[in-house]
Design a protein with these regions (language model features):
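N-terminal Rossmann-like NAD(P)+-binding domain of SDR-like oxidoreductases, especially those catalyzing
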Residues: 1-193
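Glycine/proline-rich active-site loop of Rossmann-fold NAD(P)-dependent oxidoreductases
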Residues: 170, 188, 195-207
Length: 207
């Protein structure tokens, strides 16, 4: 276990591709981890394949953690106001927000539903984090906030989001930053680019 102080951490989208790897890392560092995941296929894969992927990710988590623990998984929408009960009960030290529509074509197909997850859900989590004194909020954005780029980009370069997915991700960054300005909520923003690997769904690689 690392020498870091043990924390109680909420990972939204913790059964997703990236989230499942994050959960394993945190648990193996000795942190207490809870997962929120709505287990939605977003029309990318059918239910049978989704169930298989979720099972693979769950057992992937269970098999890669060094100490066997009770892992709390909550199947609930991040925009649901009832999350307040969970936040008040658990008093999380940190929130890592990965839950989102997974890619641009899914948001384009249903932008209204996309905004509920990517905007309303984020705002709900930020407000609950403020109300329960969460120490740090980590927001997983996207490299798509830079717009079309052909070479490597640095984090300080100008953003030019194009398309509803990228715009909502960038708007999310501004919301997170505003909660720091107004309420002192410490934050980290991460902009992953072209992430792939074990436990991802196959269509991302071949599409």
């Amino acid at each position: 276990m690392a020498s870091k102080k043990k924390q109680k951490i909420l990972v939204t989208g913790g059964l997703g591709f990236i989230g499942s790897h994050v959960v394993v890392k945190l648990i193996n560092e000795g942190h207490d981890v809870a997962i929120i995941d709505k287990k939605t296929d977003y029309g990318i894969i059918d239910k049978k394949e989704l169930d298989a992927v979720m099972q693979e990710r769950f057992f992937g988590i269970a098999n890669r953690i060094t100490d066997k623990i009770n892992l709390n998984i909550y199947t609930i929408d991040v925009a649901n106001p009832e999350l307040k009960t969970l936040f008040e009960k658990e008093k999380f030290d940190s929130v890592i927000h990965l839950a989102s529509f997974p890619r641009q074509k899914v948001v384009n197909a249903d932008p209204v539903e996309g905004s509920k997850v990517m905007s309303e859900g984020l705002l709900n989590l930020l407000e609950l984090s403020r109300q329960t004194n969460v120490g740090r909020f980590t927001y997983i954005s996207s490299s798509m906030v830079y717009g079309d780029f052909t070479d490597n980009v640095e984090e300080w370069e100008d953003c030019n989001p194009q398309g509803q997915y990228a715009i909502m991700k960038y708007a999310g960054e501004l919301l997170v930053q505003d909660y720091t300005r107004q309420y002192g909520l410490d934050h980290t923003i991460i902009r992953p680019s072209a992430v792939y690997g074990p436990l991802d769904v196959c269509d991302r690689v071949i599409s």
